[in-house]
Amino acid sequence: MKNKNIYVIAGPNGSGKTTFAMMFLPEYAKCPNFVNADLIAQGLAPFGPRAAAIKAGKLVLQQIREYAARGIDFSFETTLSGKSYVSLLTDLKAKGYSLHLFFLWIPTPELAIARIKERVAEGGHYVPAEDVRRRFVRGISNFSALYEPLFDSWMLFDNSKAKPVLISKRRNGHREVVNEKLFAVIQESARS
């Protein structure tokens, strides 16, 4: 029986999740099924995607359930700033899925806000600065406190430069830290 995999692309708003997914999923993971609330919202309301955000969120969950019912590999992106995916991922793991996380870290909410401003200028979607700041620390905190134990493997990247740089990874219960200094900074911010 083929292994079933879920690839979760996580990180703050503006950390580059969609860009990473578009490059990584087809090449590295060989996973063509990517569920993205922002892209769904843009399809529902191209001139005002924020108005379609709630409906898009519901469609994301519907698409995830559909892929899971079919037993196929898929991916989705999230900030991990909420706790709603804990039960979903637990259920999917119980159904035989292997869970893999790719967390894209950036050092400050200000960098995220600046990237979002650039994205909007290029026709992308807007996220209010107060939402970015609120979600920023919660995402890495929730990864450490809630989500990390659920994943069969994870990789933590510094995505503040042109290309993601590996900070740490865990696979088969073994964690390897590539950049001790950044990893310590991230662990400290997760406890804040």
What do the PLM-derived regions correspond to, one by one?
Residues 2-6, 70-72:
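Pre-Walker A (Motif I) flank of P-loop NTPase domains
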Residues 8-11:
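The Walker A (P-loop) glycine that initiates the GxxxxGKT/S ATP-binding motif of P-loop NTPases
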Residues 14:
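Walker A (P-loop) phosphate-binding loop of P-loop NTPases
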Residues 17:
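Conserved lysine of the Walker
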Residues 21-72:
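Conserved substrate/cofactor phosphate-moiety recognition/catalytic segment
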Residues 55-106, 139, 155:
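Glycine-rich phosphate-binding loop used to anchor ATP phosphates in small-molecule kinases
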Residues 97-146:
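A glycine- and Lys/Arg-enriched "phosphate-lid" helix/loop adjacent to the NTP-binding pocket
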Residues 144-192:
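NTP-dependent small-molecule kinase module
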